[in-house]
Amino acid sequence: MRILVTAALPYSNGPIHLGHIAGAYLPADIFYRFVKLKGYNALYICGSDQYGSPIELNAIKLNIDPKDYASFYRKIQEEIFKKFNIKFDIYSGTAESNIHPIIVKEFFLSLFSAGLLIEKEQELPYDPKIKRFLPDRFVVGQCPYCGYEKAYGDQCEKCGRLLEPKELINPKSAITGEKVIFKKTRHLFFNIPKLKDKLKQYIESKKDVWNDFTYSWSLALLDNFKERAITRDNKWGVKVPAKEMLEILKKALKEGKTPKDFGLLIDSTNEKDLENHIKEYENKVLYVWFDAPIGYISFTFETSPEYRYYWDEKEKPYIVHFIGKDNIPFHTIFWPALIIGRNLGYKNINHILDFDIALPYQVFGNPYLNYYGKKFSKSKRWGVFLDNIDKIDIDIDYFRFYLAYIHTVSKDMSFEWDQFKEVINKELVDNIGNFIHRVLTFIYNRFNGIPPKIEHLDDKDKELLDKIKQLPEKVFNFIWKGEIGNALREIVNTSNLANKYFQEKEPWKTNDPNTIAIAFEAVKTFIILLYPFIPEKAKLLASIANIDIKWDFNQKVEKINKPFIVFHKLSDNQIEMAKQILTNPKEYDLGKKKVIGVLRYEDELYKIELECDDNPWVCLKRELDKRKIKYIYDTVKGDVPPHIIDGNTYIYLLPALEKPNLEKAEEEYGLVSYLDFAKLDMRVGKIIDVQDHPNADKLYIIKVSLGNKQKTLVGGLKQYYKKEELIGKYVVLINNLKPKQLRGITSEGMLLAADDGKEVALLMPDKPISLGSKVR
């Protein structure tokens, strides 16, 4: 029996966050680890979805190649998965795989040869300046409903109304700003309704396999599924195989068929007419939602031809998809329709997959993970973002445990820091961790590390032992149904019973080997079953218990190793620091950056503005040196952190040694009045914690106590002070400074310091004074 586990392909338009992990990748990872543990022949497949309009549009805006843009984020996504210990056998990308376009074209040509495509004429927006059709998202204009000036061609983001490009008032190209015209074009549509009977038969066969929601929703939606376009006028994507289409058409015409049999809008059978008709498709690409799921197959085949058996229908593989609940119809109707259609037509064309492809066995559509009940939003900085997950002092297995513990199959979940801390400290540390550590320590100290054997059983012994023996299959049955949370909670509940048993038996009084022997059976079982949830911690526990991580709960252990504490409680400080780092998504530098240098000479300010592709400081320094402008920072080696970062704008404030030949800076950089100065609320504080900034080599994240509250600051002190030199110092800070994002971390104030261009010295009270005292 072969099991192929897949997780939804993340779109490589940005990093993934904790909601993505909880919705597909962690449940799939846990499921995969369990089936491997059980001894099944299994693969876990994933990769980035790298084509489509959003990627193309963003790349154009940044003046970079779409492939570079998509590859950049694919690497970031893969790194985040690695940090979260998501163990794929293969992680690829639709634009990285050499075989992917070949298999995608095979699917397309199979549908074409089977008569499952329909040609339709549409009138779509066109940019005459660059001579290309525009996807809906490439068109902007005034919303006809609310008047918003920057509504997209598919939706107004202000009022939320769904739109058509033609509805916009004064529609313009998002690429050039040119007024768009509407021009006729032809596209091919997948005739899904033609396969309705076969799809209904397939869905009905899953009545006892899929959960009730997935089954009933898919069946209800089937009647409303219409033809869907599978070609687009984009540049970025898998090219439509127009030449092969024409060859299939010519061959079929010789067999007595007509263009109408292929759904084409042409009556002529003249070879030249057909060539001209099909030629239009040479400049089109296949729709991203058509090519993306085929990536499951492409990525499997990247490793070795033997992996074909995970897709060959004759082999009866178990193909299991993990996705978000919004993706259910796509995987229960559209994707099976593609497979059915491909199987009907592939023998009529040149193909590399010489077998019928198996339909999905199981589709797990998981609920969403919200953040305090609300949807994740990068722009609003609302959620838990994973770019810097390795920069915090919390073990990844703690996040894995918590997300699995709160997992449900019926309603949306919510990540909350207080609950996270409570679940870890109560269930993982105090319950499971404490029980395992107590038993192992007891064996090591009282029995010289040699686990005793079971001699006799009383009723309490039998009760616990029976539950322990039944636990593996109970847990696996939950896992097989995609009920990850129920599986883990079953382990937690059984651990509670084991703790109660241990307390009631009081082996520290009796030194009863029988009690310890039964408790050790529980320990071995817990460790093995916890491995898919918390693999690194489970491996540590297994090394102490001297057992192998395998589906064998009766392993004989001659002697255990010296125990050590594996689980530690989470502190408030750990939570606060993690919250600061993980609720601030990292900003990535793609494309041009705006750099502003503000130079002060005597009482005047001057500025220079640049657009740079490389390091902002290097770019500014290069231009200042080129203009022979003398400034104090010319003695500083290496990168200099900007004083202000605002999106993709970097501002440097530099003292000039002579009057620079630059334009005067605007008033916002100029002198302030006494009344403006009086607005500053300066207070005495004490530095209580210092951490390295995860996104900047020369910045610290500094915790300052004001007595009745604490503040988090970001300061460029790393080259002037060691961490230990700062902790405990009394300092002066601006308390009412507007919070500012500095390289992804919110700074809630500013420390006062003197700077002569070579050295920096913090301003500190010269004698003891109460924390929070006002500086006047």
Curated annotation (Swiss-Prot):
Cofactor: Zn(2+)
EC number: 6.1.1.10
Cofactor note: Binds 1 zinc ion per subunit.
Residues reported in the UniProt entry to bind Zn(2+): 143, 146, 156, 159
Transmembrane residue ranges: none
Localization per Swiss-Prot or TrEMBL: Cytoplasm
UniProt enzyme class: ligase
UniProtKB keywords: Aminoacyl-tRNA synthetase, ATP-binding, Cytoplasm, Ligase, Metal-binding, Nucleotide-binding, Protein biosynthesis, RNA-binding, tRNA-binding, Zinc
Motif residue range(s): 'KMSKS' region: 375-379
Gene Ontology, cellular component aspect: aminoacyl-tRNA synthetase multienzyme complex; cytosol
One GO process term, biological-process aspect: methionyl-tRNA aminoacylation
Annotated SUPFAM superfamilies: Anticodon-binding domain of a subclass of class I aminoacyl-tRNA synthetases, Methionyl-tRNA synthetase (MetRS), Zn-domain, Nucleic acid-binding proteins, Nucleotidylyl transferase
An MF annotation (GO) of this entry: methionine-tRNA ligase activity
Motif 'HIGH' region in this chain: 10-20
Domain of life where this protein originates: Archaea
Domain (tRNA-binding) ranges: 676-776
Residues that hold ATP according to the record: 378
Record's keyword annotation contains ATP-binding: yes
Keyword presence, Signal: no
Catalytic activity: tRNA(Met) + L-methionine + ATP = L-methionyl-tRNA(Met) + AMP + diphosphate
Record NCBIfam families: PRK00133.1
Function: Is required not only for elongation of protein synthesis but also for the initiation of all mRNA translation through initiator tRNA(fMet) aminoacylation.
Family: Belongs to the class-I aminoacyl-tRNA synthetase family. MetG type 1 subfamily.
PANTHER family (UniProt xref): METHIONINE--TRNA LIGASE, METHIONINE--TRNA LIGASE, CYTOPLASMIC
Protein name: Methionine--tRNA ligase
Annotated organism of origin: Nanoarchaeum equitans (strain Kin4-M)
